[in-house]
């Protein structure tokens, strides 16, 4: 039997740079495996020092989970309380660096920090930085050792959370307070109970056979998409360029859903087969990198709607869904600052007007990100996913050949027609960007600390869209983002069947299940963007007023000094 590792031992190992993750009662050291992880290293870094049982079970099949256990270095025989991972600002000390030799609670090492401190980012020397740490010190909204509760007044006064005097920060504090009011207590025992009920739910869904994929439904999807491509190419031959471009855009929109399913290994549940399907439809036919999407999306699923860590809501300078983004946050995903610069200060206050127009150009940005991922080798370079990079490089090149050369260059008679065909076909895909952002943009962006359970975070940060079953194909499974975030490997055509079980679970644990109609959901998103825009406008106006007052004060001060000097000179004369 493996030895029991104390909390202090585990903290010491993390301080030494080891990738320590808790799975059930096992302590895993993933140092040797992380470089082979198909989902990249960032997703694992966010689990260091935490009980990742629910996350690991949700994203991996039983065969993969069995492989994890070869990295077991010990076990725990006591209730585990999550530590704050280094990538999120957790601070750890080695045993020989501590003054005391008794039991050590790693969660109580942070000092309270005010918002002014948190904005003073300090670069960490490379030699002093753990592999999982960001280049700069990250100061979490909720410090280590703090379990958020409804009694925030004392926290505000002590600046445990943030200085409430600052307008935008006060707005964010109010959102945190709302979440603490509307969701179950973050007490460790309560969150563990919610997690245990979630595991029972997972068992029910598995027993109901909902992980079995219905391939007849996928045949219908391929026939529908193939028909759209066929109509597009037929109309192209007739020189009906505009309608051809619209059909092509709609086909791309539907194709994204197949790639999404394959990326989650929810079609055949075979890693290589699903990835080949996903890469083929995404890159060869759509010109997008599945590898880029997976690297991004895996992190999004683990730290959903966190302004500092989730790349899916980091859209500055165009959009801000949280006032925290007004303060030049350091993105731990992109490893760079997200500057709230002059351009962002012009755009964000009117973002609710620009939302749909900007989404019309979303696909062009995906091209850029896809090529960067492949050319810079940002995906796995070792293990069973290493060859994906070269497959996608060939695929993206082929897409540019068939679309931009064979269709745009060879089939279009003039540059004006070429431009119109490209723009119409790409704007037609705008609806998928609406569907993607609809699920999360209006939902909570609060950081509620490390005690929050996996199911509660997913329910708090995700929204479903209500639609009749016959229209499910249009949304491609994205209308069930709540259920999908709880069970990412569940085949999309079974999500609706799981809905009643999820609603029953939500009723039992007291967590709101958010669902709106498509139009109502869009209204909620626009309303939220408008609220954030108003906060940006207010903050910028305050800054402008303060600057003017400071200038006026300086002017009057200089004026009085000058007058005094003149009077003094006259006296001397």
Swiss-Prot record:
Q: Where is the Cytochrome b5 heme-binding domain?
A: 2-77
InterPro entries, from UniProt?
Cyt_B5-like_heme/steroid-bd (IPR001199), Cyt_B5-like_heme/steroid_sf (IPR036400), FA_desaturase_dom (IPR005804), Fatty_acid_desaturase (IPR012171)
Family annotation (Gene3D superfamilies): Cytochrome b5-like heme/steroid binding domain
Alphabetically, the GO molecular function entries are:
metal ion binding; oxidoreductase activity, acting on paired donors, with oxidation of a pair of donors resulting in the reduction of molecular oxygen to two molecules of water
Identification of the protein by name: Delta 8-(E)-sphingolipid desaturase
Reading the lineage from the top rank, the first entry is Eukaryota
Spans traversing the lipid bilayer: 228-248, 273-293, 353-372, 393-413, 422-442
Motif span (Histidine box-3)? 481-485
Short motif (Histidine box-2): ranges: 297-301
| GO BP annotation list | sphingolipid metabolic process
The entry's family comment says: Belongs to the fatty acid desaturase type 1 family.
The metabolic or biological pathway listed in the UniProt record of this protein is:
Lipid metabolism; sphingolipid metabolism
Q: According to the UniProt entry, where does the motif Histidine box-1 sit in this chain?
A: 260-264
> What is this enzyme's EC?
1.14.19.18
Q: What class of enzyme is it?
A: oxidoreductase
Q: What is the role of the protein in this entry?
A: Delta(8)-fatty-acid desaturase which introduces a double bond at the 8-position in the long-chain base (LCB) of ceramides. Required for the formation of the di-unsaturated sphingoid base (E,E)-sphinga-4,8-dienine during glucosylceramide (GluCer) biosynthesis.
Q: What is known of its domains?
A: The histidine box domains may contain the active site and/or be involved in metal ion binding.
Q: Name the predominant localization.
A: membrane
Q: Which UniProt keywords apply?
A: Electron transport, Heme, Iron, Lipid metabolism, Membrane, Metal-binding, Oxidoreductase, Sphingolipid metabolism, Transmembrane, Transmembrane helix, Transport
Q: What SUPFAM superfamilies has UniProt attached to this entry?
A: Cytochrome b5-like heme/steroid binding domain
A cellular component term, taken from the record's GO annotations: membrane
Q: Which reactions is this enzyme annotated as catalysing?
A: an N-acylsphing-4-enine + 2 Fe(II)-[cytochrome b5] + O2 + 2 H(+) = a (4E,8E)-4-sphinga-4,8-dienine ceramide + 2 Fe(III)-[cytochrome b5] + 2 H2O
Q: What topology does the record note for this protein and the membrane?
A: Multi-pass membrane protein
Localization recorded for this chain is:
Membrane
């Amino acid at each position: 039997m493996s030895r029991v590792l104390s909390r202090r031992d585990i903290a010491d190992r993390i301080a030494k740079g080891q990738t320590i993750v808790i799975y059930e009662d096992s302590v895993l050291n993933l140092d040797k495996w992380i470089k082979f992880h198909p989902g990249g290293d960032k997703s694992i870094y966010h689990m260091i020092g935490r009980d990742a049982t629910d996350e690991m079970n949700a994203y991996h099949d039983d065969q993969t989970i069995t492989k994890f256990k070869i990295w077991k270095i010990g076990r725990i025989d006591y209730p585990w309380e999550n530590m704050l991972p280094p990538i999120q600002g957790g601070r750890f000390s080695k045993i020989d660096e501590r003054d005391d030799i008794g039991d050590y609670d790693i969660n109580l090492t942070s000092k309270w920090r005010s918002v002014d401190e948190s904005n003073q980012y300090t670069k960490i020397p490379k030699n002093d930085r753990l592999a999982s740490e960001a280049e700069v010190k990250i100061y979490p909204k909720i410090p280590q050792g703090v379990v958020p509760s409804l009694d925030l007044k004392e926290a505000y006064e002590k600046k445990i959370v943030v200085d409430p005097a600052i307008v935008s920060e006060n707005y964010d504090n109010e959102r945190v307070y709302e979440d603490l009011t509307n969701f179950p207590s973050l007490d460790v025992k309560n969150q563990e109970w919610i997690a245990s009920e979630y595991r029972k739910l997972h068992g029910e869904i598995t027993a109901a056979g909902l992980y079995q994929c219905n391939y007849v439904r996928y045949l219908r999807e391929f026939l529908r998409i193939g028909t759209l491509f066929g109509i597009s190419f037929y109309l192209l031959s007739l020189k009906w360029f505009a309608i051809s471009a619209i059909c092509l855009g709609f086909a791309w929109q539907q194709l994204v859903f197949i790639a999404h399913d394959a990326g989650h290994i929810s079609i055949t549940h075979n890693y290589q087969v699903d990835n080949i399907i996903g890469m083929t439809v995404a890159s060869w036919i759509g010109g997008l990198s599945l590898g880029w999407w997976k690297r991004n999306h895996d992190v999004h699923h683990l730290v959903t709607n966190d302004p500092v860590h989730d790349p899916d809501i980091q859209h500055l300078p165009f959009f801000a869904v949280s006032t925290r983004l007004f303060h030049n946050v350091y993105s731990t995903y992109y490893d760079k600052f997200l500057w709230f610069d002059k351009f962002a200060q012009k755009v964000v206050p009117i973002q609710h007007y620009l939302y749909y127009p900007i989404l019309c150009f979303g696909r062009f940005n995906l091209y850029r990100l896809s090529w960067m991922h492949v050319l810079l080798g940002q995906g796995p370079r070792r293990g069973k996913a290493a060859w994906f990079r070269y497959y996608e490089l060939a695929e993206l090149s082929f897409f540019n050949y068939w679309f931009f050369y064979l269709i745009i260059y060879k089939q279009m008679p003039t540059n004006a027609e070429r431009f119109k065909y490209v723009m119409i076909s790409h704007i037609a895909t705008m609806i998928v960007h609406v569907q993607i952002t609809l699920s999360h943009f209006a939902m909570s962006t609060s950081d509620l600390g490390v005690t929050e359970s996996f199911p509660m975070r997913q329910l708090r940060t995700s929204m479903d869209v209500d639609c009749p079953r016959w229209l499910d194909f249009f949304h491609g499974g994205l209308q069930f983002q709540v259920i999908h975030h709880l069970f990412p490997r569940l085949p999309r055509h079974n999500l609706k069947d799981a809905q009643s079980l999820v609603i029953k679970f939500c009723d039992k644990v007291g967590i709101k299940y958010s669902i709106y109609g498509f139009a109502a959901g869009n209204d909620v998103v626009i309303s939220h963007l408008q609220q954030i825009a108003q906060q940006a406008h207010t903050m910028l106006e305050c800054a402008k007023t303060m600057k003017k007052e400071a200038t006026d004060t300086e002017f009057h001060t200089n004026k009085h000094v000058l007058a005094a000097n003149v009077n003094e000179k006259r006296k001397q004369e």
